[in-house]
Curated annotation (Swiss-Prot):
<dbReference type="Pfam" id="PF03668">
    <property type="entry name" value="RapZ-like_N"/>
</dbReference>
<dbReference type="InterPro" id="IPR053931">
    <property type="entry name" value="RapZ_C"/>
</dbReference>
<protein>
    <recommendedName>
        <fullName>Nucleotide-binding protein NMC0691</fullName>
    </recommendedName>
</protein>
<dbReference type="InterPro" id="IPR005337">
    <property type="entry name" value="RapZ-like"/>
</dbReference>
<keyword id="KW-0547">Nucleotide-binding</keyword>
<comment type="similarity">
    <text>Belongs to the RapZ-like family.</text>
</comment>
<keyword id="KW-0067">ATP-binding</keyword>
<dbReference type="InterPro" id="IPR053930">
    <property type="entry name" value="RapZ-like_N"/>
</dbReference>
<comment type="function">
    <text>Displays ATPase and GTPase activities.</text>
</comment>
<dbReference type="GO" id="GO:0005525">
    <property type="term" value="F:GTP binding"/>
</dbReference>
<dbReference type="GO" id="GO:0005524">
    <property type="term" value="F:ATP binding"/>
</dbReference>
<dbReference type="InterPro" id="IPR027417">
    <property type="entry name" value="P-loop_NTPase"/>
</dbReference>
<dbReference type="Pfam" id="PF22740">
    <property type="entry name" value="PapZ_C"/>
</dbReference>
<feature type="binding site">
    <location>
        <begin position="58"/>
        <end position="61"/>
    </location>
    <ligand>
        <name>GTP</name>
    </ligand>
</feature>
<feature type="binding site">
    <location>
        <begin position="8"/>
        <end position="15"/>
    </location>
    <ligand>
        <name>ATP</name>
    </ligand>
</feature>
<keyword id="KW-0342">GTP-binding</keyword>
Length: 284
């Protein structure tokens, strides 16, 4: 049976993610105490229900991270496929969202401010984030989060999942990258008026960057680095590795390099391509 545990920071969009799981055909349970998870799985099996499970766990249920990881290992040992989805956002964004909704944080009390509660929650959940697929919703609306969840669900993962993410430095850097590479020193198609409207997926930009020796050298170097270290991460039983590639605007060079790497790594690793800012690529 496939079981998805959804966790993350309060205000980051866990409820939206859980609703998308339900719309995708999962049997969903919100805020389940972890000690009840084995009983839920057993009940599901006894009913001969083939529906996959999605369970939301967070600080409201008094989650014990050590217990959570033990439960995951135990369920996997019984042959279940257990995935962890972690939803987060930048603290400034979360503060704004709480202010707009006027809701209280689950950890807030007279002794802790909202910001202190958010920091404590982030520290508390970090060990769970380490083994999870992470979605940063700082620059997402609900529809975009739903799309990101659907894209993740499409991946049938049996081993290490390599997430190739492109972004623009002028919009900020991703906070969940395991490796980050900077493409801003490479020739920039943006300064060619004919190439500016295109993206790194379009043939005119592709042809231009294909002809740049520095660009090819950079791709070669990143491929060598990544393929050298990924086996080490697999040995540590990592489920996900995020490789972030950035350029100034996240439109030309970083997109091209991610697509080029994906072609080279295809067949060796399970891949998911993800972007942060290029909204015109959201339906790729």
């Amino acid at each position: 049976m496939k079981i998805v545990l959804i966790s993350g920071l309060s205000g980051s969009g866990k409820s939206v993610a859980l609703r998308q799981m339900e719309d995708s055909g999962y049997f969903c349970v919100d805020n389940l105490p972890l000690e009840m998870l084995p009983a839920l799985v057993s009940y599901h099996i006894e009913r001969a229900d083939e529906t996959e499970l999605a369970v939301s766990v967070d600080v409201r249920s008094g989650i014990d991270i050590g217990q959570a990881r033990e439960q995951i290992a135990s369920l996997r040992g019984l042959g279940h496929r257990v995935e962890v989805l972690f939803v987060e956002a930048e603290e400034a964004v979360l503060v704004r969202r709480f202010s707009e909704t006027r809701r209280g944080h689950p950890l807030s009390n007279q002794d802790m401010t909202l910001l202190e509660s958010l920091k404590k929650e982030r520290e508390w959940l970090f060990p769970l984030k380490e083994i999870a697929y992470c979605i940063d919703t700082s620059k997402m609306n609900a529809q975009q989060l739903r799309h990101a969840v659907r894209q993740w669900l499409k991946v049938e993962r049996t081993g290490l999942l390599v997430i190739l993410e492109f972004f623009g430095f002028k919009y900020g850097v991703p906070n969940n990258a395991d490796f980050m590479f900077d493409m801003r020193s490479l020739p920039n198609p943006y300064y060619d008026p004919e190439l500016r409207p295109y993206t790194g997926m379009d043939k005119p930009v592709w042809d231009y960057l294909d002809g740049q020796p520095l660009v090819q050298e950079m791709v070669d170097d990143i491929e060598r680095f990544v393929t050298h270290w990924l086996p080490r991460l697999e040995d540590e039983s990592r489920s996900y590795v995020t490789v972030a590639i950035g350029c100034t605007g996240g439109q030309h060079r970083s997109v091209y390099v991610v697509e080029k790497l994906a072609r080279r790594l295809k067949g060796r690793y399970e891949l998911l391509i993800r972007h942060r800012q290029a909204q015109n690529l959201s339906d790729r």
